[in-house]
């Protein structure tokens, strides 16, 4: 038995033990009393009680101890029976116990130093540490932010958290305004800034998904992401075509990864291979240049991954193979744009280094045209996989620098494969995902049945305002009901007029759907797992210590993307480089 349990038992039974010891003296008084009749003995006992209590110590006579035992046990039994049969009252909570959280409720979850926190509202914050002094206060850093258009998702929540500068950040930037307003602040706080711009490719760093392919598993992940986010509207139907496309793309990408020079491992080469894959419907024996490449590969490496996948694709007849090629060509049509080919020619983002040093990666996308948003989804998919693998293989389970993904307009970037599993596992690797939506129904539309799993792994949920019915209904139910007092009056008029008043208790939603729909524009609702909800003011960006470094404060702080991308890299003391002799490299 542990010391804690022993103390608990002692505290529970000590009163009954003390009563039993005192009762031994009454037992002694009864034993010393004279008389044969009960009344005589009771009268005599009045004179023996002072004698029995003359000695403050309990009597150890067997009969006296028996009296004490019976008294102590009898009282314990009476207390037990009363408690067992007692009516269960919850005064003031008959119809619900919901209430708003207070400063005392959030205090255990906040770090003393302001910069070591995630900003949730004006008065509530969440410590970045995954190991608080009391383990029961540990919460993951995933956040779900829901707010209609104009509710301040970017100004009141995303920007203040970006300016905290305690982690590496991956920021989805619709319209490209966040990097302009906060980029200079990140540079002045020692960050390396990187930009992927799918609106203006000329103002973007290069991103090549092939640069992060290191194994057959990575090839399959890349193909899955590409297939998931490039299927057009109403592309349902026979899954045969999609599976056939997957086989062909897997074979070609695997060939490029294992057989082609590094400079040819990109989407431009992949498209060139597809363009040379002519199929003659009336000549099954015809071999195009790609067929010849794989035939040569089969001779050198009979069991290669690329060869096996291509062999399965070649089982299709000529007409079927032609249809598969047309489908693949349509899927990769965006890469026919020369600017996009140039963008994906090589890689500058270095996604696998975000957990090594403080970096701010801005992913600029259009909020009106989703043509190139699949690139953003590919970045996130590869980012999560790369960082999780690096945390496990290099850093013993967690990254030295926490990586926060602030995914604004989450519904517009497409589907991130296996997001429901990722949000449940990235916490231990020092990675967090913050999803910003206009309505919860957006998440349901993209992730279907997995949407609830994703929401369930968000320990912090913030509602900034909105009028979407599903969101309001779910939120009102989650807030629960409180018990209120109702005052009714009755006035009966007639031959015998009467007037009466009644008081009663009833349940009422903490905030009903209509009340949520007209929530004050300066207010927000925070729900932190295991804590009462908070009705608080939104955080005021102008009060942030780093606000003066933004272009909101001074237009001179506007970040010039073009100038930054064209800068010359400076060499600093302590920088490490790998020197390679160009003459020793194998020729292409």
Task: Enumerate the language-model features and the residues they cover.
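Basic- and hydrophobic-enriched, low-structure N-terminal and domain-boundary segments
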Residues: 1-151, 155-158, 202, 481, ...
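General helical secondary-structure elements
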Residues: 4, 72, 78, 242, ...
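General secondary-structure edge motif
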Residues: 94-100, 125, 141-142, 308, ...
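Conserved ATP-driven motor cores of ASCE-family P-loop NTPases powering translocation/secretion/packaging/pilus
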Residues: 423-525
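P-loop NTPase motor domains
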Residues: 21-24, 28, 134-431, 446, ...
């Amino acid at each position: 038995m542990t010391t804690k349990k022993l103390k608990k038992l002692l505290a529970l039974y000590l009163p009954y033990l003390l009563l039993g010891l005192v009762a031994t003296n009454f037992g002694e008084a009864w034993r010393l009393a004279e008389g044969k009749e009960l009344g005589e003995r009771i009268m005599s006992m009045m004179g023996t009680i002072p004698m029995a209590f003359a000695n403050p110590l309990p009597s150890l006579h067997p009969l006296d101890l028996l009296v004490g035992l019976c008294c102590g046990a009898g009282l314990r039994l009476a207390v037990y029976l009363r408690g067992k049969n007692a009516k269960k009252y919850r005064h003031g909570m008959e119809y619900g116990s919901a209430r708003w959280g207070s400063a005392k409720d959030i205090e255990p979850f906040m770090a003393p130093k302001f910069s070591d926190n995630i900003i949730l509202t004006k008065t509530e914050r969440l410590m970045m540490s995954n190991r608080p002094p009391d383990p029961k206060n540990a919460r993951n850093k995933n956040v779900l932010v829901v707010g209609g258009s104009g509710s301040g998702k970017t100004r009141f929540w995303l920007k203040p958290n970006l300016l905290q500068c305690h982690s590496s950040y991956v920021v989805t930037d619709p319209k490209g305004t966040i990097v302009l307003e906060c980029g200079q602040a990140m540079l002045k706080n020692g960050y390396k800034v990187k930009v992927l711009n799918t609106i203006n490719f000329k103002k973007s760093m290069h991103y090549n998904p092939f640069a992060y392919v290191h194994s057959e598993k990575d090839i399959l992940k890349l193909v899955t992401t590409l297939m998931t986010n490039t299927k057009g509207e109403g592309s349902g139907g026979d899954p045969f075509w999609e599976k056939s496309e997957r086989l062909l793309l897997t074979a070609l990408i695997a060939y490029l990864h294992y057989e082609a020079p590094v400079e040819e491992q990109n989407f431009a080469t992949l498209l060139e291979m597809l363009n040379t894959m002519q199929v003659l419907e009336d000549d099954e024996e015809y071999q195009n240049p790609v067929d010849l490449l794989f035939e040569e590969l089969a001779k050198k490496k009979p069991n290669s991954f690329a060869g096996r996948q291509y062999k399965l694709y070649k089982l299709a007849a000529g007409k079927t193979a032609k249809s598969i090629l047309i489908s693949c060509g349509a899927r990769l049509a965006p890469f026919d744009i020369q600017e996009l080919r140039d963008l994906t020619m090589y890689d500058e983002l270095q996604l696998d280094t975000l957990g090594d040093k403080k970096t701010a990666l801005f992913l600029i996308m259009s909020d009106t045209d989703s043509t190139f948003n699949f690139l953003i989804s590919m970045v996130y998919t590869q980012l999560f996989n790369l960082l999780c693998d690096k945390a496990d293989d290099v850093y013993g389970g967690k990254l030295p620098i926490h990586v926060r993904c602030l995914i604004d307009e989450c519904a517009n970037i497409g589907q991130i494969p296996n997001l429901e599993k990722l949000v449940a596992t990235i916490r231990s690797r020092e990675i967090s995902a913050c999803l910003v939506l206009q309505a919860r129904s957006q998440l349901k539309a993209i992730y279907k049945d997995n949407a609830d799993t994703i929401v369930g792994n968000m320990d912090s949920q913030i509602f900034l305002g909105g009028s979407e019915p599903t969101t309001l209904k779910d939120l009102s139910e989650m807030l629960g009901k409180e018990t209120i007092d109702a005052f009714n009056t009755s006035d009966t008029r007639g031959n015998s007029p009467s007037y009466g008043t009644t008081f009663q208790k009833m349940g009422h939603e903490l905030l009903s759907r209509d009340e949520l729909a007209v929530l004050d524009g300066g207010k927000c609702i925070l729900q932190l797992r295991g804590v009462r909800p908070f009705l608080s003011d939104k955080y005021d960006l102008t009060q942030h210590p780093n606000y003066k470094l933004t272009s909101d404060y001074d237009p001179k702080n506007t970040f010039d993307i073009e100038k930054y991308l064209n800068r010359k890299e400076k060499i600093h003391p302590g920088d490490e480089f790998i020197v390679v002799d160009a003459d020793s490299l194998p020729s292409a």
